[in-house]
Structures are given as C-alpha cells and as structure tokens.
Design a protein with these regions (language model features):
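Positively charged n-region of N-terminal signal peptides that target proteins for export
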Residues: 1-4
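Short amphipathic alpha-helical "recognition" segments used for binding
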Residues: 6-7, 59
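Hydrophobic h-region of N-terminal signal peptides that target proteins for export
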Residues: 9-18
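Activation on beta-sandwich/Ig-like modules and their edge loops
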Residues: 19-151
C-alpha cells in the first residue's frame, strides 16, 4: 500500500512540475531585420545599426502586458527590458528597433508603411544584431523563454 501511495504522489508531483515548465507560446518573434538596407559604411560617425529590428506578434485575442519582459541578444549585456505598461494588442505586432544615441533615426524614415496599420515601435540601444547570426529570445516577467529564434 505504501508503494502505491508513493507512486501516486510521485506521479502527481511530476505532472505538476511538467505543467510549471511548459510555457504557453502566445508572443512570437515574427521577423528579424539584422542587416538593414542602410549602407554600413555610409560615413564616419554614422551609426550602422540603425534600421535593425525585431518584430513580435501577439497570437492571442487579448492584449498582453509586457511589463517586466525582456528581449535578449547573443551577448551577455544584450538585454532590453520592456518599459512598464508596454502593451501588445490582440493579433498585432510590436517592433523593437535599434536607434543609435542622438542619431534621431526613425524606422519610418527607412521603411514604408503605406497601406498598413501603423505598428507600435520601441527604440532601444542594448541589442545590436549580428550579421553573421545569433539567438534572440523573448523572456517573460518570471524568466520563462516564451519564444526564440536563431538565424
């Protein structure tokens, strides 16, 4: 009888642990622009990483609050934390673009959005995407990797 109870408790505990590890994939990385059409050797002092971006898509029918979430790149210091109250609307995209300090660069200056609903664009200076490849991850506010892409 003791063996039976221990078996049932072990089974129950393992199911609970598996349920906690599994993360629902509702925010996905839908696009990565790691090599923008900007000429990377335009002129001395012109930042070459402007135009790089990561696009996220909300698969849910409800808005998702990204407060406390992070976007991570390949380097140890490449961590962008979403500002408080950052919302990604249902079935919508959110773009996180690189913007070199004091460059005044706007993604709208580089890409045309004619005929498309305007997407929310956040600018950051933490993640510079490698042209030779890396892994980019979306991490929720409790540390679970919600999605990642390796290119």
């Amino acid at each position: 009888m003791k063996k039976y109870i221990v078996f049932i408790l072990s089974l129950f505990l393992s199911l609970q642990l598996n349920a906690q590890v599994s993360v629902k994939k509702y925010i996905v990385i839908s696009e990565v622009m790691y090599d923008s059409p900007l000429n990377e050797q335009i002129a001395q002092g012109i930042p070459y990483s402007n135009g790089e971006y990561i696009e996220l898509y909300n698969l849910e029918n409800t808005a998702v609050d990204l407060t406390g979430w992070k976007l991570t790149g390949g380097g140890k210091t490449e961590i962008y934390q979403f500002p408080a109250n950052t919302i990604i609307n249902p079935r919508s995209t959110l773009i996180v673009a690189y913007q070199y300090k004091d460059s005044g660069f706007l993604l709208n200056d580089l890409y045309s959005y004619d005929g498309y609903e305007m997407t929310t664009i956040l600018y950051q200076r933490k993640i510079i995407l490698s042209n030779s490849g890396e892994t980019v991850s979306v991490v929720d506010n409790v540390g679970n990797v919600v999605d990642y892409i390796t290119y």
